[in-house]
Amino acid sequence: MSQSLRIVFAGTPDFAARHLAALLSSEHEVIAVYTQPDRPAGRGKKLTASPVKNIALENNIPVYQPENFKSDEAKQELANLNADIMVVVAYGLLLPQAVLDTPRLGCINVHGSILPRWRGAAPIQRSIWAGDKETGVTIMQMDIGLDTGDMLSIATLPIESTDTSASMYEKLAGLGPDALVECLADIASGKAVAEKQDDELANYAKKLSKEEAKIDWNDSAEHIERCVRAFNPWPMSHFAIVDSSSNDEKSIKVWQTRVDEESTSAPAGSIIKADKTGIYVATGDKVLVLEQLQVPGKKAMSVQDILNSRASWFEVGTQLS
């Protein structure tokens, strides 16, 4: 058995909470948890604790929620914990060098991609968006750069042709905790080997925007199909269509599509066929088949259900924008 480490855990969302749960079941001791301050959530905008805070409180672990680490008090508070190592998973706050240097073994981070391929805020989404065939989690020794630290462990899995960001999130949330516990065992026993990243292979996974999720029908069908999966569950790929009965423009969210290899001379964005198998739309090259859509005020529905109630919106020749 490896040496037990005194761990400070820093994280905020559910993805991080699953890693914390794994640490609590390991031989290591989680002596404190850092998470972002409670935020307003829901219709009532009630202050809500993070998933990480909830797990910490359930296990009687002290919780710290600084707005940042700029003050000497916040830094000293961490130093007083006398931690061996700090584990950071989707914390959401920048850690200055003084914080990175505080634990005896420094700080390690679980990152949701194979570094250095995708550094930054949205690696899961960007890997699908780019058509990558695999992704994974990288555990790295943190430095002051953005996901630039030396790599301690990489665990990989394939990206399937039907995977969305939501499904990959679940897969990585299952992969990461085991990889983290194994990596900590290597660190505790002195077996961990750090590998420098090749900066020339790095890409920046910038945050997603609603504007980016608007479909450009001049793109290739394959790229649009990947965008639909990458932007699910947020911000959701969408297009605009005019309701012929009211002449109002409606925003339609796209949940599921497939590529049809058929080529067409129809203008990009025009509907060339609509039946229970899908709504067939011309793109910059092939045909994209819309299979599941969401109209304003409704839940996502199959195209067959959409056409039963709103066939006039999706007549052949209609131009989507």
From Swiss-Prot:
Enzyme class: transferase
CDD domains (alphabetical): FMT_core_Met-tRNA-FMT_N, Met_tRNA_FMT_C
Binding site for (6S)-5,6,7,8-tetrahydrofolate: 113-116
InterPro entries: Fmt, Formyl_trans_C, Formyl_trans_C_sf, Formyl_transf_N, Formyl_transf_N_sf, Formyl_transferase-like_C_sf, GART_AS, Met-tRNA-FMT_C
Catalysed transformations (reactions): L-methionyl-tRNA(fMet) + (6R)-10-formyltetrahydrofolate = N-formyl-L-methionyl-tRNA(fMet) + (6S)-5,6,7,8-tetrahydrofolate + H(+)
UniProt-listed PROSITE patterns: GART
Function (record text): Attaches a formyl group to the free amino group of methionyl-tRNA(fMet). The formyl group appears to play a dual role in the initiator identity of N-formylmethionyl-tRNA by promoting its recognition by IF2 and preventing the misappropriation of this tRNA by the elongation apparatus.
The name this protein goes by in its record: Methionyl-tRNA formyltransferase
